């Protein structure tokens, strides 16, 4: 009886190659983070620049801080497009983010302009420590009380690193 080892060896070689390539590319990890803090706003006509500073906790980097600079435009209420960079920093590293097109903040209504919900996606633009090679896009959502300056934020997604 003849045995055909060729196909078996080929399948084994392909399986080993797939494992090696997967390891070389890096791993994917679910990422979650929650932050809260205070926003400082500068309004110039319909242009708004917000500077959030907060504390919280992110998977992979631990307890730490959130900082950023967010640009918005209030000329088309009740929603405003958002853009700008941000940074999450913890004892195990730093993650740099950039808000993507489609990110927005919306007031609850014309009679409640200080009650603002915001959401969108942020692209990872760099990192340090355990997230030095991080890539991916995170979804974020949160609430901002324009009257008090208080905000809370949640980020979720999958990072390749």
Language model: regions and residue ranges:
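Bacterial N-terminal signal peptides
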Residues: 9-20
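Beta-strand-enriched cores of mature, soluble protein domains
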Residues: 25-161
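Bacterial N-terminal signal peptides that target proteins for export
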Residues: 1-10
